[in-house]
Amino acid sequence: MKRRRIRFLSMALVAMMLLVFTAACTKVDTGKAGNNGGNDAPQEATRAKFETLKDGDPIHIGIVTGTVSQAEDEFRAAQEAIKKYGNADEGGMIRHDTYPDRFEAEQETTISKIVAMADDPDMRAVIVNQAVPGTSAAFQQIRAKRPDIILINLTAQEDTVMAENSSDLVLDADNVSRGYRIIKAAKDMGATKFAHITFPRHMSIELLALRRAIMEEACKDLGLEFISLNAPDPTTDIGVPGAQQYVAENIQPWIDKYGKDTAFFCTNDAHTEPLLRGVAAGGAIFVEQDLPSPIMGYPKAFSVDIQDKAGDWNAINAEVEKAVVAAGGSGRMGTWAYSLGYSLTLGAVDLVQEVLHGKMELTNMDNVIDCIDNYTEGAKWMGVNYVDRASGEKKDNHILLAQDTYVYGKGYLGMDKVEVPEKYMTMNIDLDAIKESQEQAEGETGE
């Protein structure tokens, strides 16, 4: 039988959430979260033990991301880091590798690729984005043999406690406040219904399930109908092409069934491109992506050539905006002006360099945001520390971040000024029940 444990969010989170945009209560197993490569979550947090470097000391930074088909923003960020700082194999600083598209089924490969970074004697930090299942197990192995390496976990897809204990720093989107604000944004954009597209595996991820529960409750409070839909998990045998084909074939029937004033949201990157294309063609609404970015799905969905604009987010967003407006999505489709995955990856690269040279502190929120700001001029990043739902303890090494929603043809929506009601900060949900409910939702899971 599954072990269940109720953990409650401290009221201390409420005050912090007035400043930003993730957390609430859930029922989770904080010992083992799915298959983690055969390793239990560490009972005690471990941190890197490194010496401050001098100018000229060798420094390599490892980056592990998904492939361009599953995680384009993170992949492009790693390539940009190589362009800026050089390839480690050619005398530069950055060593980049990718984990398999079917990382859930090929978890040992994922673990081995991350751990292999530590074989480089000049490796000083390893950054994983997105931190898919297997990341914590890999970090534990690295810590055992190379305690001097700084370990950075970005957008964790494993148990929260496990991610925090095995990493020196965890950065993620603020999904609790977004759970409310995305629904508020959808209503402001004209939606009367909200369709949440996912699959059971994603609903076993604590913060994604929590966000979904908050979205459903927010729909009740704000007068929208909440619709739960399934689409195939790309990590199953159906793969990315099959999952994308399913969304492409079903988005118009969903719009026909639920109406054009339905806001569609998906939790998977691979689903995003066909969803965007279908939403525009059908005249529906799309607030923002799971991991918002102008290049998450939009360029391919609307045939926007941005190759000569790499890293110039204002230019990229302007080109995407033209295409979206031309496709009829003005005022109905949005994103963040700067990519979360891209910004966090490059910001983390700069942060660890400053930390290794004794110029910044790894878990200092101002330092973290300053490094991200190097790539997001004009963005107003909001940050808050995650609070453990069992103990009420503020986690100094777990920072949650957010931006305002940018609506094409309209501009910023002002979601950063929306106060999230207190009830969403203290919700109690059953993680197992949410996953089981998702298994019964309309659509196919690929399992």
How would you label these PLM feature ranges?
Residues 23-35:
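Bacterial lipoprotein signal-peptidase II cleavage site
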Residues 42-111, 127-133:
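Extracytoplasmic "Venus flytrap"
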Residues 44-46, 317-447:
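Hinge/cleft segment of the Venus flytrap/periplasmic-binding protein
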Residues 45-49, 54, 168-196, 246-249, ...:
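Hydrophobic alpha-helical segments within soluble ligand-binding/sensing domains
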Residues 61-65, 120-132, 149-154, 195-198, ...:
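Periplasmic-binding protein-like
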Residues 78, 175-228, 352:
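An alpha-beta-alpha
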Residues 141-173:
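Flexible loop/hinge segments that line or gate small-molecule binding clefts
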